[in-house]
């Protein structure tokens, strides 16, 4: 088999789990001598992508699948030309709109297309549109696999988001504490997410829970990392809480590319999906809740269950609520098991989610997909 040349395709390079995942894939593929290029729109993570040394091609993808034929034709021609110039042997899409265009370009270029679905929150009709022209599908969790199985008759590979455990590892936080005017002995709860829709609601529930938790933990501080359309509403709520508590203890950092520094600062992290995994890699205790509901404290005994629902982001048995978040954070604080639990969680992430291990089944899928595609072409 000839050497593999991969083109990764994303809508944009904004700061979020999917883009961070692709960044880690690019690093790992290149470290193994696999040529990897990326085509994407704008985004604040472009600078980090450039540092990997990969070839970056910027393209303005539509925001929805609905696009006029002239605009689609221009995009397709540009992509087909790019695939030819880069001598790409496999295209890997990660988001619906760019993935749909890329899959069509791959078909026109007689190149196999792989699509990774990163969540269950996309319209089923959009998922179907991409999967019907996909040669191999990847789900990042078991619930995502179940979600797309009715639309894809072939085998679906489960390949989790890999974590760069060298980058995400325990580190000191005194300098950042001083910068944010957080006392050395203060207890810090961190929430990291885009502040939109379900994730914004979780943020509101957390802030309300922390208002009550402040009575139990007088030296409590809360850090909210992320931007989004509902950030203003969250800030207004925080201002009201500060007024009633007569103390400003909720901090907003906006979007951060080096979120690992904030994990290091936190005693506890509330999050889901990739945030939960990154925090655990940094030895931080995690309360997981996501798009589909609440899981709770993650520990070595329930780690497998937490992974199976992707830490509340792709499945859940109960809804998130202010009362349950308050209860679990208070119990976690009173148990004083943060440090040993954090160490156990990092070991589990190293064992199951290290990007250096996760990349291996993906490379195998690349090789088998190209081989199957070429065999089918020979028959036809």
Task: Say what each PLM segment does.
Residues 3, 8-16, 20-22, 27-70, ...:
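N-terminal strand-loop element at the rim of the active site
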Residues 7, 182-203, 207-210, 223:
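Conserved donor-binding/catalytic core segment of Leloir-type glycosyltransferases
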Residues 17, 316-367:
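A charged, aromatic-enriched C-terminal amphipathic alpha-helix characteristic of glycosyltransferases
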Residues 78, 169-182:
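A short helix/loop element that forms part of the nucleotide-sugar donor recognition site in Leloir-type
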Residues 93-99, 117:
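Short His-centered aromatic/hydrophobic patch
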Residues 134-170:
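Donor nucleotide-sugar binding/catalytic pocket of nucleotide-sugar-dependent glycosyltransferases
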Residues 225, 234-256:
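Nucleotide-activated donor-binding/catalytic signature segment of Leloir-type glycosyltransferases, i.e.
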């Amino acid at each position: 088999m000839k050497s593999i040349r991969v083109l990764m395709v994303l809508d944009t390079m904004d700061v979020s789990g999917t883009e961070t995942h692709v960044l880690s894939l690019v690093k790992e593929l290149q470290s193994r001598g696999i040529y990897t290029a990326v085509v994407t729109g704008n985004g604040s993570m472009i600078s980090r992508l450039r540092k990997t040394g990969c070839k970056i091609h910027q393209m303005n993808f539509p925001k929805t699948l609905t696009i006029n034929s002239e605009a689609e034709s221009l995009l397709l021609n540009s992509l087909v030309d790019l695939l030819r110039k880069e001598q790409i042997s496999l295209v890997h899409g990660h988001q619906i709109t760019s993935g749909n265009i890329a899959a069509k370009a791959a078909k026109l270029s007689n190149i196999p297309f792989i699509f990774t679905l990163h969540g269950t929150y996309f319209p089923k009709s959009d998922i179907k549109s991409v999967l019907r022209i996909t040669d191999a599908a990847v789900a990042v969790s078991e619930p995502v696999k179940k979600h797309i199985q009715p639309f894809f008759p072939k085998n679906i590979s489960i390949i989790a988001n890999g974590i760069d455990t060298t980058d995400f590892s325990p580190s000191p936080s005194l300098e950042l504490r001083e910068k944010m005017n957080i006392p050395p002995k203060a207890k810090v709860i961190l929430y990291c997410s885009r502040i939109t829709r379900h994730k914004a609601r979780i943020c509101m529930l957390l802030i309300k829970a922390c208002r009550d938790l402040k009575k139990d933990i007088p030296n409590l501080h809360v850090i909210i990392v992320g931007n989004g359309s509902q950030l203003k509403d969250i800030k207004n709520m925080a201002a009201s809480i500060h007024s009633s508590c007569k103390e400003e203890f909720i901090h907003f950092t906006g979007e951060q590319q080096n979120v690992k520094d904030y994990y290091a600062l936190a005693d506890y992290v509330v999050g889901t999906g990739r945030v939960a995994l990154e925090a655990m890699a940094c030895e931080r205790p995690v309360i997981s809740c996501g798009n589909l509901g609440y899981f709770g404290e993650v520990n070595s005994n329930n780690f497998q269950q937490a992974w199976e629902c992707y830490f509340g982001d792709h499945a859940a048995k109960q809804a998130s609520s202010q009362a349950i978040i308050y209860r679990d954070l208070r119990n976690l604080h009173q148990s004083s098991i943060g440090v040993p639990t954090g160490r156990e969680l990092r070991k589990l992430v190293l064992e199951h989610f290290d990007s250096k291990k996760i990349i291996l089944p993906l490379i195998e899928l690349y090789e088998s997909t190209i081989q199957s595609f070429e065999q089918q072409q020979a028959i036809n």
